[in-house]
Amino acid sequence: MFVGTNRIKIKKGYGKELEELFRSRGEVAREPGFVDFELWRQEGDPEHEEYLVVSRWESEEHHNQWLRSDSFKQAHSGPPTDYIMGHGEFSNYQIRLAYQAEK
């Protein structure tokens, strides 16, 4: 499984706006190979808010196809938001080991 992350720093007090922005971008759920999406918020930084966008894909190729898709272009074509600080920090991972709770 392939995981893409994007670390985004925003001005303090704009977390709800960023969350709503991602809430309105559900088109990725229809993309081939898409597994799931999570938006994580870091706690405790007094100077800014930090989020980690996490998307999981069946393969890196599925992720790359999405990056070239019309839905990706649409999701990233809106006006710039002035509360985002700089550019996101992208990272990619391959899951090598995972555990689940025993029931």
Residue ranges of each PLM-predicted region?
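An amphipathic, aromatic/His-enriched active-site/gating alpha helix that lines ligand/cofactor pockets
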Residues: 20, 24-35, 56-91
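A cross-taxa feature marking solvent-exposed loop/turn segments within ectodomains of secreted
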Residues: 15, 30-32, 46
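Short, surface-exposed ligand-recognition loops at beta-strand->loop->(often short) alpha-helix junctions
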Residues: 9-18
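Short, well-ordered beta-strand segments in beta-rich or mixed alpha/beta enzyme
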Residues: 2-8, 38-68
